[in-house]
Amino acid sequence: MITGLIGINGSGKTTRLKNLYAQHAPGAAQFVPDNPIIPIEVSAHELLHRLGRMHRLPRAEAKRRATILCDELAIDGGTTRAISTYSAGNYKKTALAIVFIKPAQHLYLDEPLEMVDAISRARILRILRRISNLGHQVTISTQDFTIAEQCDAIEVMADLEVVAEGAPRAVLGGDPFTRLMELSGAEFTDCQADWLADPGGANTEVGPGLESQAGSETSPATGLAADGRGE
């Protein structure tokens, strides 16, 4: 089962992940923080191979899994360059591969899809689904409604508490942005940064249910117009 934690910044998603992780006996769970710290002097392949051996995998199997993960996650330089040279996205994918080499029964991943490209995101979600299908419990935090909707269940966090839980569609309905504001007690008010206002006075402000003056509907969650152009 894949459970997604969703909520505004500071709502308690990371705290909940840590608390859940701490309830397990050593070795029964793995936790990957939002900003993981991993060895950087070796390549991803070498690191994964070493960790596989630490997990008592046979040498050939550890090497095989390391090779597959570097390829599956498209880690650029995964077999040839030190992790210290990686981009933020490839660094993040390497950190996730560490728990994929031999997953524990419970995985707690804080913003695992942040900073990775769209294709890598789909690949990571596919791996998480495979792990879940093997009977493991996967819990992730996310700010992305499209990711939350792919989870089996979600928990909405507010003020360090779970304020709603259940199937994504049942909890968030057809308007996730507005529903999250309601559950979180948040507001989408007028922008107070008056020095950034249009000097011509044109009404180009956008928000839930609003349209720009040009009539191009804009998503408050992404800032993109309906035709894909940024405002």
Predicted regions and their residues:
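Q-loop/switch helix immediately C-terminal to the Walker
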Residues: 35, 42-54
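H-loop/switch region of ABC-family ATPase nucleotide-binding domains
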Residues: 141-143
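Catalytic Walker B motif of ABC-type/P-loop ATPase nucleotide-binding domains
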Residues: 107-111
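Helix N-cap at the start of a conserved alpha-helix in ABC-type nucleotide-binding domains
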Residues: 118-120
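Conserved ABC ATPase signature
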Residues: 82-89
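Conserved ABC ATPase "signature" region
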Residues: 49, 61-78, 97
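Conserved beta-strand-loop-alpha-helix hinge in the C-terminal portion
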Residues: 161-184
